[in-house]
Amino acid sequence: MLKKVFETTNLKDSFQVEIGTYARNVDSSILVRYQDTVVLTTMVFSRKPNNLDFLPLTVIYQEKLYAAGKIPGSFLRREGRSNDHEILTSRLIDRSLRPLFPDYFQQEVQVINTVLSLDPDFKSELASMLGSSLSLLISEIPFFEAISGVYVGKINNEFIINPTLQQLANSTLHLIVAGTKHNVTMIEAHANEVSEQDFLEAINFAHQYIKKLCLFQENIKQQFAPVKMTKTLHQTEQIQQQSFFAKNHSQVKQAILSCNSKNDLQQLKEQILDQAKQTPFFKTIDAITVFDYEAHKKHLQITENLFQKLSKQEMRSLILQEKIRPDKRELEEIRTLESQIDLLPRAHGSALFTRGKTQSLAAVTLGCLSESKIIDGLSDEQNKRFMLHYNFPPFSVGAVGRYTAPSRREIGHGTLAEKAISQVLPEEKDFPYTIRVVSEILESNGSSSQATVCSSSLALMASGVPLKKAVAGISVGLVFDQETNKYVILSDIQGLEDHVGDMDLKIAGTNKGITALQMDLKIQGIPFKILQEAFLQAKKGRLHILEQMNQTISQPRLEVSKYAPKVCMMQIKPEKIRDIIGSGGKIINQIIESHDGVKIDIEQDGRVFVMHSNLETVKKTVAFIESLIQEIQVGTCYQASILRFLSDKQGKMIGAVAQVCPGIEGLIHVNKMKFQKITDVLKIGETVLVKCTKINERGRIDFLLLPKKTQEKNS
């Protein structure tokens, strides 16, 4: 491969691309420099043909901690399995690229993006997307159009391309858009209740910048002039397809129109495959005729692929031409909705949300702030106090499957729902808890991630988390004939419609605006007009769902569950923190032990969070801490406990050490007492009333023991 270097011009940010210098055993090697961010993209594909009905594309995004000058914190001190950010970025790039591959290309492709250096203000995700696109574009793979991605923020009603971290912190919109020079192919965002119109304007704004980056890649492609792989359908394959379609057309259509289309289609498929198994295949080896297993296996695979193709064609035709959906709903009709709360007595909050044959059970757990998730990646270490986990067990689709670690899909769906809900959560100062929501998908027939948004919102309200507003989510689909430009937009798509459709647009939000969004396409783009219609149709469906949810619970409960821990926040002076912790944590451990294992979190700014399941224990702990940090004043009387007696080197009694609270001790000097033998009057552990008479420059305190009459009067 030729070694060449290219650089963008007339753009806000400068990208430099170096091709063919590194990792030269691959099909494509791209080094992308985006200011101080450096990403190496490699692409390798298999020459072995596959007879599959999908593209075996694998996109990997990996961060090396040396890119930010950090040593991994794990026991082995090396990078381990991919973290959530790496998985989500891998999915982001995959979803941007996949629509650009032709249906006939089914060879295995692996694109790996390795972050070698990182400037946090210049996103490695964008450099990876550029490198991934270019690696495919200059190869012989039939990937014909460049894609690029940009971030968009919004500050003071102005859109900003590729904002810095500081700008993003003040932005009401966090939007990532990917696309070709003609159309948008992928959208992902979370926002602070941003309107549909503002979103559409932001997407259009992003596309203007995307066009320039795509043209930059097209210019590089021209210099390499790659010869692309092509495929034409052979006459034998055409005849085989026509014969199969003619023979099974009416049966497939009838199965789709049945009341139980999904099961009927599956039964029909098994019936056709059983018939195909009866077809004999033989070959001759050394004048001996034997059964040809390979040919038989290939025949079954072709039959299954043809069935999938015919089913898709018939379903799309019914939707496009006759406006008939598999479950006979109207185009904008939402499936039957059901919801209930408080299913799990001991969980801190729970809700079940059912939409048609999709069902999500959400459970909420409230914990102390020290239980927040620590995120340690290339960026600075952060604490995450809200987590939403999505579980998709195989039984949810009536299948037998393996139980393993969360898949990339589960992590992606959970993060989307998490972003949707996080926009309406209370501030930490108003609700000092770590919040974990788990969504268990009990049934699935499409839109399970958006069912998770709904069940989570209901469960959080039921748990007493003061959400600003309820949040609902909906998936909108599209069937688009690119030859005639005829299209149909479908609200609340189910599994079959998602499978045969061209778009999956997931939008979650409140009655005011959008809080999270994700759009994936199976075609190379859609006109902006269709996107506008889809946004408005999604809004209509979202408001309908919110109305139904509000009938179950419309406002957060005023108190948390009786099983949830109670918390109290107090503000102290930062210099008083040491008085609570003590030497080696001695004092704070004493507080925890003497107050039934209470949890205490202390922040550097002086905020102290006290948490326990018993509210009285919380109050007693707070009162004790307040006594710890109180400042002794001369002339003020205090209850004190006698700790020990002091003697000088000759053994002569000096006085008694009295403790007002842990860390605050003073001396009752024998000279200030009217009796000679102090041990006759005081006993260790006895509580007495003392008066502070002096605090010297070194902080030493002198106490005066008050007469018993005064003590009795004060008691």
Swiss-Prot record:
Q: Which GO terms describe its molecular function?
A: 3'-5'-RNA exonuclease activity; magnesium ion binding; polyribonucleotide nucleotidyltransferase activity; RNA binding
Annotated SUPFAM superfamilies:
Eukaryotic type KH-domain (KH-domain type I), Nucleic acid-binding proteins, Ribonuclease PH domain 2-like, Ribosomal protein S5 domain 2-like
Give the enzyme's main class according to its UniProt record, as a single word: transferase
In short, the EC number is 2.7.7.8
Task: Report domain S1 motif positions.
Answer: 635-709
Signal peptide range in chain numbering: none
What cofactors does this protein use? Answer: Mg(2+)
Start and end of every KH domain?
A: 565-625
Query: What is the predominant subcellular site recorded for this chain?
Result: cytoplasm
One GO biological-process annotation of the entry reads: mRNA catabolic process
What reaction does this enzyme carry out catalytically?
Answer: RNA(n+1) + phosphate = RNA(n) + a ribonucleoside 5'-diphosphate
Where in or outside the cell it occurs: the entry states: Cytoplasm
Could you tell me which Pfam families the record lists for this protein?
KH_1, RNase_PH, RNase_PH_C
Q: Does the keyword RNA-binding apply?
A: yes
Give the UniProt keywords, A-Z: Cytoplasm, Magnesium, Metal-binding, Nucleotidyltransferase, RNA-binding, Transferase
Record bears the keyword Magnesium: yes
A GO cellular-component term linked to this record: cytosol
Task: Give the family this protein belongs to, as stated in its UniProt record.
Answer: Belongs to the polyribonucleotide nucleotidyltransferase family.
What functional role does this protein have?
Answer: Involved in mRNA degradation. Catalyzes the phosphorolysis of single-stranded polyribonucleotides processively in the 3'- to 5'-direction.
Q: Which HAMAP family match?
A: PNPase
Under which name does UniProt file this protein? Polyribonucleotide nucleotidyltransferase
Recorded source organism is Aster yellows witches'-broom phytoplasma (strain AYWB)
